Each structure stands twice: as structure tokens, then as C-alpha cells.
Curated annotation (Swiss-Prot):
Chief place where the protein resides: host cell
Annotated membrane topology: Multi-pass membrane protein
Gene source species: Ostreid herpesvirus 1 (isolate France) (OsHV-1)
Coiled coil: none
UniProt feature, compositional bias: Acidic residues: 67-84
Name assigned to this protein: Putative transmembrane protein ORF103
Annotated region (Disordered), positions in chain: 43-91, 253-282
Keywords, comma-separated and alphabetical: Host membrane, Membrane, Transmembrane, Transmembrane helix
Membrane-spanning residues: 125-145, 162-182, 326-346, 366-386
Any single GO CC term annotated in Swiss-Prot or TrEMBL for this entry: host cell membrane
Length: 423
């Protein structure tokens, strides 16, 4: 019985090292690029290998053997659908290792957002400084006129002293905001200048291109580079997971909340998919502190009060941090002081006239000192009211929009239920 002859074709693989496949092939064909023709009798166990045209992804490590001989296999487009963004490796022993650079590295760690946030904090520093200077400028005349006004015009020191206390409170609030803004600005700047940023940029650049993934044989050096990049990314996999948890905790701290269920953790992980990066434990700790300092909402509550209600809604009743409670209280305190201030200030002009009568003066002939100090105190009151209205208006507007939205949703839900009942 005649046996048909079969050929075995060996292709040149350039500088790509594919252990242990290349070792087995080169052991039989020492001259690369040579086509060796053998009979079936000489190699009864060898089957013909035909090259695949434009394979999608190369299976570098394959455990498919034919009598202790390993061959290079090709992963088709069906396999690529299983891992759209990465490469599939089958290591000896049948264990499939899947790494996807874009899955772990993400599209981009948004360093630009940090820079923009830092610029925003810088604008806050300027705005808070102006506010601090304004109230400090009012503090000086109020303090200077306090004692003469009390002696000449006011039998009870309520109005002038209360005006002074309000200014001191607003200065304290502006001072805290200014200090935290400066601290955050410096910490974020220090992080942006740290080696961690270079490490992030290097890893983000280690993503194989679509051309290399689509036709690896077209550029073997690029294929080898992409394999190396993938291995490097895989080494950082556990570090990325640890950092993801750290950044996720920072995000929860932003909203003054704590994650309390696995579903919420999954949602946070989805939001942070593109914000993972490699770093060692020291850099991760430094990054965590920098981001936490940056995202402390203390200065944002005073400058952008509409965030207060947003985060309250986002927490869904979860426990707020002590800092969030403190800032929320500081936002409410001026509103309460305004009410008391108006009540006290409205009766002050009568008290001034009564005091002038006791001094033997004409109640209709009010001294200039009394008029100037009284007007200054009312100016402080008006400015305090305007400042708090400006800061509280977005919160009230947001609350009204939320109520209106809830009413519409409830109405639509009821209408849908009525339609179902009619059907």
C-alpha cells in the first residue's frame, strides 16, 4: 500500500521568542526559512501545518500536543470575542491566562481632571481671600465704634456686640475654608510632581495597538513588545486592585458616605473602571492621602452649597462623616443668626431714642455717632443676609427641583398602574 508524501513548512519567526515552541521547531530545522520535505515514513507522527491568513490573535502558549510535540495554534475571531480588549494565553498544562491591558489600566487615569480641580481650588482661594478681606475691613470700624456707641447710644449692648460676633463668626468660617483650600492645593500639587504620575503615564502607554493585535505576523517586533507589555501589566494586576479599593474609598469619602453592600461596591467599581493605576504601597498611600485631601468637601460646601443636597441624596440615608456634619451645621448657623439679628435690630432704634431721653437729649436729634454706627451694623446685617442667601439659594432650588421631580415620577407611576389595571 502506497503512502502519500506530506510536507512540513517552517516559517521564519524573526526575533520573536516563543518558548517552548521555537525550541522544538528549531531542533528539527536548524536553518530558519528553509522548507524541509520529509516522507511519512521518516516522520510518521508529523501532520501538515498550514499557515492561517491574517489571524486575529496568536496563542503563544499552547498545550495541544501530538506525541510530545507542541505546535503554535491560532486563536480565531470567536476567541477574540471572548476577550475583546486583550490577548488570550494558554500556558502549558491547559491553564488559560487572560489579561486585558485596557481592562486593568483603563482608558486613561484622568490627571487632567486633577489639574483642572487644582485650578478651581486656586480660584476658590482667591474668592475666599476677597471674602475674608471684606469682613475683616468691616471688623475694624465696628470694633473701634463699639465702646463709644455703647456708652452714648445704646443702653443695652445687644445690637453692636451681636454685630461684632457675627463678623467674627464669618471671619472664622472664611479662615477655615481658606486654610483647607490652600492645604488641598499644595497637596495635589505635590502629588502631580511625584514619580507616581510618571509611572501612571508609562503604564498607560503600554497598550498594544489594534494593528498589532489584528495582524501580529506583520510586525513581529511589535508583537514581542506587546507580549512584554501585557506581562508587565499583569504583574501590576494585584497592585491595581488594591489601589482601586483605595480610590474607591476616597470616592465614598467625597460624598460623606460609607459603602454598605456588595451592590454598592460593584457600582463604585464601575465608576472607577478608568481610574486605576499601578503604584507601590508607599506611593499608593501618598496618592490616597493626596486625593482624600483634595476631595474633602469642606471648602466646597461654603463655596458651592448646592453640593450639600446632592451628596445628601447620594448617600441614601447612609451615615455622614463628622466633617460633613460640621460643615452642614456651619451652613445652617448663619441662617439662624440672621433671624435673631433681625429681631434684635428692629427694636434697636427705639432703644436708642429712649437712651437719648434718659441722657437729656432730644430723641429726634440723634447724634452722628449713633447714626453712623447704627447704619454700619445694619450694613453688616444686610451683607450677611445676602451672602447666606447666595449660598443657600442653590440648595433651596435643588430641593424644589427634587420635590417637583418626585411628584412627577409618582404621578407617572400611578398613571402607569392605572393603565395596567384598565388593561
Amino acid at each position: 500500500m502506497l503512502r502519500s508524501k506530506r510536507t512540513k513548512v517552517v516559517y521564519k519567526t524573526a526575533d520573536v521568542i516563543l518558548p517552548p515552541v521555537e525550541e522544538n521547531i528549531n531542533s528539527e530545522n536548524k536553518n530558519e526559512g528553509e522548507v524541509k520535505v520529509t516522507t511519512f515514513a521518516d516522520e510518521p507522527k508529523i501532520e501538515q501545518e498550514e499557515p492561517q491568513q491574517k489571524p486575529e490573535v496568536v496563542d503563544v502558549y499552547s498545550n495541544e500536543t501530538d506525541k510530545n510535540e507542541e505546535e503554535v495554534s491560532i486563536i480565531t475571531s470567536e476567541d477574540e470575542e471572548e476577550d475583546e480588549k486583550g490577548m488570550l494565553f494558554k500556558r502549558p498544562g491547559g491553564k488559560k491566562h487572560n489579561y486585558a491591558p485596557s481592562k486593568y489600566v483603563g482608558e486613561e487615569f484622568d490627571l487632567d481632571a486633577l489639574k483642572e480641580h487644582r485650578k478651581m481650588v486656586k480660584r476658590w482661594i482667591i474668592g475666599i481671600s476677597v471674602r475674608f478681606g471684606f469682613w475683616f475691613a468691616l471688623l475694624i470700624p465696628v470694633a473701634v465704634l463699639l465702646r463709644p456707641y455703647t456708652i452714648e447710644c445704646e443702653p443695652i449692648n445687644t445690637f453692636s456686640e451681636f454685630s461684632l460676633c457675627v463678623i467674627l463668626f464669618l471671619l472664622l468660617q472664611a479662615g477655615i475654608d481658606l486654610g483647607l483650600a490652600i492645604f488641598s492645593y499644595r497637596k495635589v500639587g505635590k502629588f502631580l510632581e511625584s514619580p507616581a504620575v510618571d509611572e501612571i503615564n508609562i503604564l498607560m502607554a503600554m497598550k498594544p495597538t489594534g494593528g498589532v493585535m489584528g495582524n501580529p505576523h506583520a510586525n513581529t517586533e511589535a508583537l514581542a513588545a506587546s507580549v512584554k507589555m501585557g506581562n508587565i501589566i499583569n504583574v501590576h494586576r494585584h497592585k491595581l486592585g488594591a489601589l482601586n479599593k483605595a480610590v474607591k474609598k476616597v470616592t465614598n469619602d467625597e460624598s460623606g458616605s460609607e459603602v454598605s453592600s456588595e451592590d454598592e461596591e460593584s457600582d463604585q467599581e464601575t465608576l472607577l473602571r478608568n481610574r486605576k493605576m499601578p503604584t507601590n504601597s508607599k506611593t499608593r498611600s501618598q496618592l490616597f492621602r493626596a486625593l482624600k485631601d483634595l476631595n474633602k468637601r469642606t471648602n466646597q460646601y461654603s463655596v458651592k452649597p448646592e453640593k450639600v443636597l446632592e451628596y445628601s441624596e447620594a448617600t441614601k440615608g447612609k451615615r455622614m462623616s463628622a466633617g460633613s456634619k460640621l460643615i452642614s451645621a456651619m451652613t445652617v448657623i448663619p441662617l439662624l443668626t440672621i433671624l435673631f439679628f433681625i429681631i434684635v435690630g428692629s427694636s434697636t432704634i427705639t432703644e436708642i431714642k429712649s437712651h437719648l431721653v434718659l441722657k437729656g437729649h432730644d430723641p429726634n436729634d440723634i447724634p452722628t455717632l449713633c447714626i453712623a454706627t447704627y447704619s454700619l451694623n445694619w450694613f453688616v446685617l444686610i451683607m450677611c443676609v445676602l451672602q447666606n442667601l447666595i449660598r443657600s439659594a442653590p440648595i433651596i432650588s435643588h430641593a424644589l427641583k427634587g420635590i417637583d421631580r418626585d411628584i412627577k415620577e409618582a404621578y407617572m407611576k400611578k398613571a402607569a398602574e392605572d393603565d395596567e389595571d384598565e388593561d
